[in-house]
Amino acid sequence: KNDLFSMSHVNPQRVKDAVTNLQAYAKGQDCGDFFVRKAKKAETDHAGQIVKKERPARVAKQYKFTETIEIQVGLKNYDPKKDPRFNQPLVLPLMPKTNTRILVLADAADCNRCQQDNVEFHPFDTLAQTFDKNKPGPIKRWAKKYDVILCSKSQIKNIVKVLGPTLTKINRQPLPLEPTDNLKAKLDDMRRTIRIQFKKVLGLNWPVGMVSDKAEDVTRNCMLAINTLVDNLKKGWQNIKVINVHSTMGPSKRIF
């Protein structure tokens, strides 16, 4: 743990403080002046003295979902056309978000496994009957309902033949499911996996936890994601312009 934190230019205590305050904000608690707020005009009394206005107490809003905590990274001195792109999966210790939807494109054996473990699947043999590879629209709408798509190892080479290149173009390239894989463990890994990815834009973001998680666990996810990104950048920390942490419905806090 100390080795992980010591090789980062980001102060882990600052990250933890930001996460803790986001959690407090989600509960409706006052976070003081921790977050950057819009400037307010100062009022004066008749004697010309500045009067401090009391800020009204916050009331936590109730949402039908659990807020996710994300990190946002802005890059600098990085040319998407010249500098290397990367796409590295990273399995985090803590599941970074809820409701990760996973689909298995299954051969006959994996259809049985998925049924036994109550895992959503689509028989691979029926894909050609369901979709036309020359009509990408329906394939896109179907695939985008899922965060992760797995495919039985026996059929992984036939994906493009049956569905064309559409899944790759929308970043839903199926990942192989080995016959020897423990299905439940595989899905657990997928739910804890984020992709440290750079393609064209200089702004990157990843989920690293939920406001209901322990601040220490979210902090560790943050540090792992940041350090993995830095390892992939051409000039490391010299390519990092800014790093913010924020929650789904909350404000942002700069941590670098």
What are these regions (language model features)?
Residues 1-158, 236-242, 248-256:
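Polybasic, low-complexity intrinsically disordered tails and interdomain linkers
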Residues 121-233:
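Long, charge-patterned amphipathic alpha-helical coiled-coil/hairpin "stalk" segments used as oligomerization
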